[in-house]
């Protein structure tokens, strides 16, 4: 009879299906390296309303302009929504890209497009931004290269599972955020893991020679040792432990998942993680406002305002804003005309994004939409152009050639060019 140690004792699985030892095994042969810049992608899942946030049309008819009014920012000529006063006072720190357009008004496909910079294909699985960074700039094995706050939606695609994100649970204000939140089973503390590691060692001796080991068996060999080192490492545990923050600093970001997630992303960048995706699925922060658009945005926009402002301030205070590329966007915009339920529906023909950090020139608006925010008023920009710009700001050439898992050469981005005015 063959005994499977994985059936007897498991280290908690990551959202990608990788245990921490497996994650380390796949990165073992890689050499520590550093990108030109770290990156944070704030994915506003659901498709936020561009005309109620960063692209208001106060002169449009009431059924289009809606309830919100624009307010002036600290940069002359730039206005944003009245429910984002903190970002209004920091407009010099970021750039707004308006007139982004595509033709994929579907959540699933739209997310794939915006999370990879490549229009979805039936034949190719494209990697998300963080996986590309992980491929190009693997980090020290004692710290993950790429962390996804909440489960990754796209994954590493043709690059392979060794470039998957290390998935972290969404943090909650006032709840200690320890390593068990990112890698261990619910309720398994580091102290308990120590005793279970001892059991692992005993089992390894007892069952040695009774089974053929393959690359998917977790909790064995030197990678288990590395996994334990990471779990028990003060440096790594500290990066994920929001309870170490001063309460006032935590409050600055907001007492909600969005604010605490951006606080966690800042801590990870400070610790040396190369890329963080902050993905918030529809729940507390649902931008898919088919109904009650304005009442929901009265909650959503102030929270986003506070969290992003906190992130920009913290990175600048710690001299990291110039070395961190930041992008915030959803999968599409919303319809110009308000529907009968007081909401706005999917609209991919116009949307916007916010870019900051690195070489991005803050205090500007690039691109524009027409009088009803329905279309770009000129040629517009594609998600591919956003991706090329984001990669350039990180330090990765968008025409870099990779190999698919079957050995076929493929260019990182099929289309798109960096938006020159951003830099």
Regions of interest found by a model, annotated:
Residues 1-423:
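Ligand-binding pockets and gating/stacking loops
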């Amino acid at each position: 009879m063959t005994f499977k140690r994985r059936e007897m004792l498991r280290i908690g699985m990551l959202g990608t299906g990788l245990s921490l030892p497996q994650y380390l095994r796949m990165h073992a042969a890689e050499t520590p390296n550093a990108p030109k810049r770290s990156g944070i992608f704030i994915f506003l899942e659901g498709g936020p309303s561009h005309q109620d946030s960063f692209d208001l049309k106060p002169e449009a008819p009431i059924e289009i302009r809606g309830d919100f009014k624009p307010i002036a920012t600290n940069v002359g000529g730039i206005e944003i929504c009245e429910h984002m006063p903190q970002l209004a006072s920091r407009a010099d720190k970021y750039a707004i890209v308006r007139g982004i357009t595509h033709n994929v008004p579907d959540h699933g496909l739209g997310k794939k497009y915006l999370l990879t910079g490549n229009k979805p294909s039936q034949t190719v699985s494209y990697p998300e931004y963080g996986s590309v960074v992980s491929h190009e700039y693997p980090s020290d094995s004692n710290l993950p290269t790429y962390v996804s706050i909440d489960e990754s939606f796209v994954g590493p695609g043709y690059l392979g599972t060794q470039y998957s994100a290390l998935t972290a649970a969404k943090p909650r204000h006032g709840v200690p955020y320890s390593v068990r939140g990112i890698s261990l089973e619910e309720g398994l503390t580091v102290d308990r893991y120590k005793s279970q590691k001892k059991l692992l060692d005993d089992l390894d001796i007892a069952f040695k020679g009774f089974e053929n080991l393959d690359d998917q068996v977790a909790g064995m060999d030197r990678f288990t040792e590395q996994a334990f080192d990471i779990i028990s490492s003060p440096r790594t545990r500290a990066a994920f432990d929001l309870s170490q923050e001063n309460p006032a600093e935590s409050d600055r970001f907001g007492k909600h998942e969005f604010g605490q997630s951006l606080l966690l992303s800042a801590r990870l960048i400070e610790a040396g993680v190369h890329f963080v995706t902050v993905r918030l699925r529809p729940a507390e922060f649902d931008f898919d406002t088919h109904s009650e658009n304005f009442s929901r945005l009265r909650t959503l926009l102030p929270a986003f305002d506070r969290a992003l402002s906190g992130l920009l301030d913290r990175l600048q205070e710690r001299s990291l804003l110039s070395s961190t590329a930041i992008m915030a966007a959803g999968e599409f915009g919303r319809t110009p005309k308000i529907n009968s339920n007081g909401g706005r529906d999917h609209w991919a023909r116009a949307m916007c994004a916010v870019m900051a950090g690195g070489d991005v020139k803050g205090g500007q608006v690039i691109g524009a939409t027409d009088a009803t925010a329905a279309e770009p008023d000129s040629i517009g920009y594609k998600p591919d152009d956003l991706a090329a710009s984001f990669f350039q700001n990180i330090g990765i050439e968008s025409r870099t050639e990779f190999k698919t898992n079957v050995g076929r050469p493929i260019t990182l981005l099929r289309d798109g060019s960096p938006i020159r005015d951003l830099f």
